[in-house]
Regions:
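Hydrophobic alpha-helical membrane-insertion segments, chiefly the h-region
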Residues: 13-24
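Short, well-structured active-site flanking segments
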Residues: 101-111
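N-terminal Sec-pathway targeting helices
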Residues: 1-13
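Active-site catalytic microenvironments for nucleophilic, acid-base chemistry
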Residues: 95-100, 185-188
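Short, solvent-exposed loop/turn elements at domain surfaces
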Residues: 97-98, 105, 207
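A short glycine/serine-rich beta->alpha loop
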Residues: 74-84, 116-117
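Conserved active-site-adjacent core of cysteine acyl-enzyme catalytic domains
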Residues: 23-62, 66-73, 109-207
């Protein structure tokens, strides 16, 4: 049986670099015009290091993907769509529970009640901690554990936990906040990090 290990973290900003040409053409969110301002942050990589025929602009079968020399991914991780606008946290937790147990222990609204999820602000990290404490699982969280504070340490953190078969539940606080599960990381086989890819199980992904 798989060891029940889980990581909970608040990630204020997760920047998935690479494929920015695609974003410029497809994203409804303005991300700036190259050359209009000095390049800073992710903007400095616009058009650089794009991977020709990248599999991530197709529809990869993440469920059946296998790790290789540059991809680390949790196999057979099933995604779940959240049933309300505010239960991304409970849905993310249930995805992880199902990954380990083959089924959920509580329905999404029951998990939301245990977490103290709110229709106005959703679920905070303490709520996540409350649920996994209730079901008796071993886990780490940003409430009590050290979390990476730079890109290089973050990559090590992600790779080491995925190789240890440990999903990472993360929340970004931009645009109202949203919980997802990191299930994979791909270096794309290059030394630079501007084309790296994080693979997330997103309970609000309707594609």
């Amino acid at each position: 049986m798989k060891t029940k290990r889980i990581l909970l973290a608040i990630v204020c900003l997760i920047v998935i670099l690479g494929g920015l040409n695609y974003l410029l053409q497809q994203s409804p969110m303005p991300i700036g015009t190259p050359g209009s301002t000095p390049a800073d942050g992710a903007a400095q990589f616009v058009g650089k290091h794009d991977i020709k025929d990248s599999p991530y602009f197709k529809h990869p079968d993440f469920y059946n993907m296998q790790s290789d020399e540059h991809l680390t991914i949790l196999p057979k991780f099933a995604t779940t769509q959240q049933i309300t606008h505010y239960t991304c946290g409970p849905a993310a937790a249930n995805m992880v529970v199902k990954y380990y147990k083959g089924k959920t222990l509580d329905d999404e609204l029951a998990v939301a009640k245990i977490m103290g999820s709110s229709k106005t602000v959703g679920t905070n990290t303490k709520g996540m901690v409350n649920y996994f404490e209730k079901i008796g699982w071993e886990f780490h969280s940003s409430i009590k554990d050290k979390t990476p504070d730079n890109y290089k340490d973050f990559l090590k953190f992600v790779e080491s936990n995925l190789k240890n078969n440990t999903p990472i539940i993360v929340e970004n606080v931009d645009w109202g906040g949203h919980w997802r599960v990191i299930i994979g990381y791909d270096s794309m086989g290059t030394a630079h990090q501007s084309d790296d890819v994080l693979i997330m199980a997103d309970p609000y992904d309707t594609t």
